[in-house]
Swiss-Prot record:
Domain annotation Helicase C-terminal: ranges: 694-852
Keywords for this protein: ATP-binding, DNA-binding, Helicase, Hydrolase, Nucleotide-binding, Nucleus, Phosphoprotein, Repeat, Repressor, Transcription, Transcription regulation
Region feature Disordered, mapped onto this chain: 22-147, 956-985, 1163-1184, 1205-1299
EC number: 3.6.4.-
UniProt protein name: Chromodomain helicase hrp3
Domain Helicase ATP-binding: 387-557
Binding-site residues for ATP, renumbered to this chain: 400-407
Annotated SUPFAM superfamilies: Chromo domain-like, P-loop containing nucleoside triphosphate hydrolases
């Protein structure tokens, strides 16, 4: 029997339990009638239903487009009915009136109004992908979080580490109370099987025939678990839902038998299966226990029924039960319900003080109404501090170190408000989903007399809470004292919750508010409340900007905190500011540390265990570095953090386990010819990772010595690997990460903390499992991989090291030797200094800290270099791992008594700061020194072969796209010196000359925005993100695009002139396809280029603000501001300066003074929503759509004026038939108005109207120049030899033959030209001048030498062509070859 099958059995049973009884969510809200499931006369029960699936809006900030990896599924496609509860639940209460039926049915109407997204999601089975909709019946689906090779071998790769962890942070908070469903409607008067819970062997039978030998525990539709019955197969085979019994036989009974009879199954496997089965049965018994009486109803016959909420189930599983059934088993809960109904603490009976608060009186001892235990002295001080702030009408941050009982202090304070000050609420407490159980237990223990409700669950659950728990019957008076909810439901139901006037709002784990632009921050800021309290053990995690957000949330506008404090270069002003900030914040932040206030708490020690990498890890680590050699050497100069961060994430994965890379495990198993045996899989998991070898030895000893262990990792796939290892080793364990539903989390935590629990290990993700979870029954913490943020690791340690812990806590931090993990750990520790400098100490001079929470490119490079050189020297690592001695590693471990660390900090001790003094690694070595030349050459050769293959594939694809046309001869290669062979050059040419379809589309949009490349080359390539492409490639593609567009326009005009019946006003957009890019509007492109050319020519040189529109235009009507010729002129000036469509930049440009003329935020209308009258006063115009229309109209008016102006001044035609050149237009540019005397005719008066201006329009040339000037379009696409003289000071493209010749002649200085192109970015002014001088001098001398060796009749042409060729390599922007010659002459 394979390990996968064993895991399948365990997870199948888990899935059935989790889906059917804990995470239950009924997607449709529907109440119908049905009969009792039995003949005993038990009243049928009312069932409250759900309409909600997981809603992306629940998470506030945004939903990323990342692919989510779902756990593996087991699907039986043969069955038409699954083992899960049916979609439509029916039930009523005997004797209830029709009007009360209608009260519940009213929810149906709301369900029908749910958005289509939610409704469609409701049709999905649990765990299914919401994007796929189907009305067909779903096949049964199981969550297989323990099946090997499913989740951890997924193909999705995400190099963005923050986004990688964020996905699990988000999933951690999701609503996971789901119920897989059936779609078919059920007849009303029939019994229906909801879930098959269990089975038992009938006495006297051997179990060989399951359908005859077993009885099945059935939960009936619309009835609680209290009414489950044992039924033989024959009794239920004809009842609706009987297919679920067949599925249970196949997927539970037969599979269990198969595993037990398999000879490879161990006793540990069978024991684990039995333990899981017993745990499941215990949960079923818990579902029969009353959690809370929600409501009471008196029937017309005098009988009483109670609306019951059952333990571990949500409000949508509430059922109406007869008093005769409930009173014997829930007398305490009924009495609590009566006390709540008659409570003197009702909010309506409270006192409203407003802003005038009573005088503060210190609590000398614990009040009698604070029950549940005895507060420690420091906790009573915390209650007094919160009370003192309340009396002063101030807000504060309770920032005690993790594990000091911030929850207890907060609950005690709220109880103080209710009893001592008659502030009966309502109070709002917002907490993370994972801490809800802890808050519920604390509230029940320490404030049992307050009416506290948990606002959780799906749509129906929350609706039931609002209907029965929010208000006193028949009134709008608040009924509860305290509402406990999570961040997600605050966002989901902000419209409901924000309308309640809260007397006090407490927010747990408040560092979630560190981003002042988040939806959660915005929503909570709008809540109406008298006072606020933020609860966080880490008030400052990364930088002071986060603290500023928290303080501004508490006291808006009261403090102004700088977003950056540079502790590396302190000055007197900064020192004074930090002292002042510390003094001002001190009254509002209470922070105590364990060592100072809790002397009885056992100590905590941390040991860093360094371990060698395995051979497979070494292989991957070196390959990652070598394959990214080019990125490593270039990222510093280019300032690219993203590329380096990707490499860092990959190296961290290699440092943990090579199985984190796709396909590695399969390759290794094939290499050893594995048959998939248990011992082979286990050996691969352990021996291929140095950390796993160490962990295996460490866990063996800890198990023997009776310790219990928490293992933390950042990576969920790493938890998958650890889970497989623990299962194969037979170690009982629990798991909690962002993919585990909330209800299952609570069950797992309770099972681990239960007395005599068999669980040995608890696997947790650092981010999802490090918040507010109490696991103090463990005394050992293993941090498998350190977090970037040291506070996350401290949170993880605090799960075990907290009040109530009786044993010394040992923390083991696993670290791969000579890898980036060592440097990341040291750098992450430095972040802690800032917190103590601002929060605790007010330190001003000796400490160092990063300015922000993001690593720069230089820092990332230094991290990557740490230990990299040793990686290429290490040998025999696998032998070292096989011979590992645990005692020796523990003996040489680096010890840290972290309790003393923070204690020294709170007292302002110098010892604390000394412990953060680290030796900086000298990162002044180059990657050439680190990565051996042989390694680089090997991978360079592989890259070269791969590039050739890709180029060949691209050539084949391009040929098929273009109809197998030969590549145009004018498409010459970019200057490249990667090889000298003819075959290589052609492939390199093909690669350089082709832009991706996405790049071409961006180039098209940039030209629509800015016009021709001749005027705005830099703006266009920047907008299109083509700065890394060769200039002549971009020009060539742009020229081809313009040519294709002009041809399409000409053809369309010709067709239009031939078809006289065609109505011009009904013409459609002229869309063409260019190099695979579809929907390019040829007419718009040609027209825009022409219009912007005219606009550029009309713009004066004296400044954009001096431009005046030279013609009369029609005025605007109905705009919200005064708009006249000045505004039209400035709009055109803004288009010329910033581009067509850059309305935001135009509005904010102080030179144009259009700030009060453009209203982008006020209106976001479509073309059909432009107001035609003045009634719509709340929307101001012009908005973007109006500006587009006005801009197009003004450009057309300017074009028409230009055409008419040209017609009046016809140019003289020479005798040889050539048009005389235009005169200089300097005067016109200076005045901003056209000069009539200097204008010449550019087109015939009989020209056919066309959106495109004639291509023969010439640019003005110098007055002394007698040589004919080619048109702008001709010069852009020209392939013949240049005809302009050197005096013209312009560049003309070289043709293919000329470029090939120049490339050959300039080969000796190719390195200097490449340095000009690549090495100039990111340099300072001095370094740039030095580089340009060196390279330009060398290139110039070579050109002079080459020209001297050339025949005299060719010298001028060769000299000009070589300098023009050198222009291609000039950094960043275009330069004319004559300018290069001039610079070189000055340098000589």
């Amino acid at each position: 029997m394979s390990t996968s099958a064993i895991a399948l059995a365990l997870s199948s049973s888990k899935a059935i339990e989790q889906l059917d009884h804990v995470q239950t969510e009924t997607p449709n809200l529907k109440q119908e009638m049905s009969e009792s499931p039995s003949n005993s006369g038990v009243a049928s029960k009312r069932k409250l239903q759900s309409t909600e699936w997981l809603d992306p809006e629940l998470y506030g900030l945004r939903r990323s487009g990342r692919t989510r990896s779902n756990p593996g599924r087991y699907v039986d496609t043969d069955d038409q009915e699954d083992v899960f509860p049916s979609k439509h639940r029916k039930g009523t209460r005997n004797g209830s009136s029709f009007s009360r039926h209608r009260t519940i049915r009213d929810l149906d109407d709301e369900a029908e109004s749910v958005t289509s997204e939610e409704s469609e999601s409701d049709d999905s089975s649990y765990g299914g992908t919401p994007k796929k909709r189907s009305r067909q019946k779903k096949s049964n689906t199981y969550v297989q979080d323990e099946i090997r090779f499913s989740s951890r071998n997924s193909k999705g790769v995400n190099y963005n580490e923050d986004a990688y962890f964020e996905s699990f942070e988000e999933e951690e908070e999701e609503e996971m109370y789901e119920y897989a469903t059936e779609v078919s409607e059920e007849p009303e008067d029939t019994r229906a099987i909801d879930v098959v819970l269990d089975h038992r062997l009938i006495e006297g039978h051997d179990g060989s025939t399951p359908s005859e030998d077993y009885e099945f525990l059935i939960k009936w539709v619309n009835f609680s678990h209290l009414h489950c019955t044992w039924e033989p197969y024959n009794n239920i085979s004809m009842i609706r839902g009987s297919k679920k019994v067949d599925n249970h036989i196949k997927q539970v009974i037969l599979l269990d038998r198969e595993i037990r009879e398999d000879p490879t199954t161990t006793r540990e496997d069978i024991e684990a299966m039995d333990i899981e089965k017993e745990r499941k049965r215990e949960n079923y018994e818990e579902y029969k226990q009353v959690d809370r009486i929600v409501a009471k109803h008196l029937n017309s016959d005098g009988s009483v029924e109670y609306l019951v909420k059952w333990k571990q189930l949500l409000y949508d599983f509430c059922t109406w039960e007869a008093s005769s059934i409930i009173e014997p088993i829930a007398a305490t809960e009924i009495q609590a319900f009566q006390e709540r109904e008659e409570s003197a603490l009702s909010p309506s009976r409270g006192t409203n003080y407003g802003n005038s608060r009573p005088k503060y009186r210190k609590l000398e001892q614990q009040p009698s109404y604070i029950t549940g235990g005895e507060l420690r002295d420091f906790q009573l001080t915390g209650v007094n501090w919160m009370a003192y702030l309340w009396h002063k009408n101030e807000n504060g941050i309770l920032a005690d170190e993790m594990g000091l009982g911030k929850t207890v202090q907060t609950v005690a304070f709220l109880s103080y408000l209710a009893h001592s000050l008659r502030q009966h609420g309502p109070f709002l407490v917002v907490v993370p989903l994972s801490t809800v159980p802890a808050w519920q237990e604390t509230l029940a223990l320490w404030a049992s007399d307050m009416n506290c409700i948990s606002y959780l669950g799906n749509t129906t659950s929350r609706q039931v809470i609002r209907d029965y728990e929010f208000y006193v019957d028949g009134t709008q008076k608040i009924k509860f004292n305290l509402l406990l909810t999570t961040y997600e439901y605050v966002l989901k139901d902000r419209s409901v919750l924000s309308n309640i006037k809260w007397q006090y709002m407490a927010i747990d784990e408040a560092h979630r508010l560190k981003n002042s632009e988040s939806s959660l921050y915005e929503a909570l800021s709008q809540f109406k409340n008298s006072n606020r309290l933020l609860i966080t053990g880490t008030p400052l995690q990364n930088n002071i900007r986060e603290l500023a957000a928290l303080v501004d949330f508490l006291m808006p506008g009261k403090f102004e905190i700088r977003e950056e404090i540079n502790l590396e270069a302190p000055d007197e002003e900064q020192e004074a500011y930090i002292r002042s900030l510390q003094e001002h914040l001190q009254p509002y932040i209470l922070r105590r540390l364990k060592k100072d206030v809790e002397k009885s708490l056992p100590s905590k020690s941390e040991r860093i265990l360094r371990v060698e990498l395995s051979d497979l890890q070494m292989y991957w680590y070196k390959n990652i570095l070598t394959r990214n050699y080019r990125v490593l050497t270039q990222s510093i100069s280019s300032g690219s953090q993203i590329s380096l961060l990707n490499i860092v994430v990959e190296l961290k994965k290699a440092s943990n386990h090579p199985y984190l890379f796709d396909g590695v495990e399969e390759s290794w198993m094939q290499k050893i010819n594995s048959q998939g045996r248990r011992d082979e899989v286990l050996k691969g998991l352990i021996m291929n990772s140095g950390k796993m070898v160490l962990l295996d030895k460490l866990l063996s000893r800890l198990r023997r010595d009776g310790h219990r262990v928490l293992i933390f990792s950042q990576m969920v796939r790493m938890l998958d690997i650890l889970g497989d290892y623990l299962s194969l080793r037979g170690y009982p364990h629990q798991r909690l990460d962002g993919t585990v539903p909330a209800a299952v989390r609570r069950t797992s935590i309770d099972h681990f903390n239960a007395p005599n629990s068999p669980d040995f290990v608890f696997l947790l993700s650092t981010r999802a499992g490090g918040l507010g979870i109490n696991l103090m029954t463990a005394d050992t913490v293993i941090i498998f991989d350190s977090d970037w943020n040291p506070q996350a690791d401290l949170q993880a340690m605090a799960r075990a090291h907290r009040i109530g812990q009786k044993n010394h806590v040992m923390v083991y931090r696993l670290l791969s030797k000579d890898t980036i993990e060592e440097d990341v750990l040291e750098r992450a520790r430095r972040k802690m200094i800032l917190e103590y400098a601002i929060i605790s100490l007010g330190v001003t001079d000796k400490q160092k800290n990063s300015k922000n929470d993001k690593f720069s490119a230089e820092e990332l490079s230094a991290i990557l270099k740490f230990g990299a050189s040793n990686m290429f020297k290490a040998e025999n690592n696998q032998k070292k791992l096989e011979d590992m001695n645990l005692d020796e590693i523990l003996e040489h471990a680096e010890d840290h008594d972290t309790s003393n660390d923070v204690g020294g900090a709170s007292m302002g001790g110098e010892e604390f700061l000394k412990q953060f003094e680290v030796t900086d690694y000298k990162a002044d070595v180059s990657w050439d020194d680190i990565i051996p030349l042989t390694e680089r050459e090997k991978f360079e050769e592989e890259d070269r072969l791969r590039e050739e293959e890709e180029a060949l594939k691209q050539e084949i694809e391009l040929s098929s796209r273009r109809g197998n046309r030969p590549y145009p001869s004018s498409a010459v290669e970019s200057p490249s010196y990667s090889g000298t062979s003819e075959r290589k050059s052609k492939k390199q040419m093909l690669k350089d000359e082709v832009l991706l379809e996405k790049e071409i589309r961006l180039l098209y949009r940039a030209m629509i925005r800015y016009g021709s490349l001749e005027h705005r080359y830099n703006d266009i390539v920047k907008y299109a993100d083509l700065t890394t492409q060769d200039a002549h490639v971009i020009k060539k593609i742009a020229a081809d695009l313009v040519t294709a567009s002009r041809k399409a326009v000409s053809a369309a005009e010709k067709d239009l002139s031939n078809d006289q019946s065609n109505n011009k006003s009904s013409r459609k957009a002229l869309l063409i396809t260019f190099k695979g890019v579809k929907n390019i509007n040829a007419e718009t492109l040609v027209q825009r280029l022409n219009d912007l050319d005219i606009l550029y020519d009309a713009m004066p040189t004296s400044g954009y603000s001096n431009f005046q529109i030279p013609m009369h235009v029609r005025s605007v009507h109905g705009w919200s501001c005064q708009w006249g010729p000045r505004e039209d002129s400035m709009l055109l000036s803004g288009i010329c300066k910033h581009g067509f469509g850059a309305w935001l930049e135009i509005r904010d440009d102080p030179e144009l003074k259009m700030k009060d003329k453009i209203f982008l935020e006020d209106t976001k209308q479509t073309d059909n929503s432009v107001p035609k009258d003045k009634e719509n006063k709340e929307k101001k115009v012009p908005s973007a759509v109006h500006l587009v229309r006005r801009g197009e109209y003004l450009l057309s008016a300017l074009r028409e004026h230009h055409q008419n102006f040209g017609i009046k001044s016809s140019p003289a035609i020479s005798t040889n038939g050539k048009t005389q050149p235009k005169k200089q237009t300097a005067n016109r540019r200076q005045s901003g108005k056209p000069n009539v005397k200097s204008a010449q005719k550019i087109e015939s008066a009989t020209r056919t109207p066309s959106p495109a201006i004639s291509e023969s329009r010439k640019k003005p040339s110098s007055k002394d120049t007698k040589i004919e000037t080619p048109s702008r379009e001709q010069s852009r696409s020209q392939t013949a030899s240049p005809v302009k003289s050197e005096k013209d000071d312009g560049n003309v493209s070289l043709n293919a033959e000329q470029k090939a010749r120049c490339k050959e002649l300039m080969y000796p200085v190719r390195k200097h030209m490449k340095r000009l192109r690549k090495d100039s970015s990111g340099l300072g002014r001095a370094e740039l001048v030095k580089l340009l001088t060196e390279c330009l001098t060398t290139i110039g001398k070579h050109i002079e030498k080459t020209v001297n060796d050339t025949p005299s009749e060719e010298k001028a042409t060769v000299r000009k062509n070589l300098w023009m060729f050198a222009c291609y390599f000039w950094p960043k922007e275009e330069v004319k070859y004559t300018s290069l010659i001039s610079m070189y002459e000055k340098m000589k």
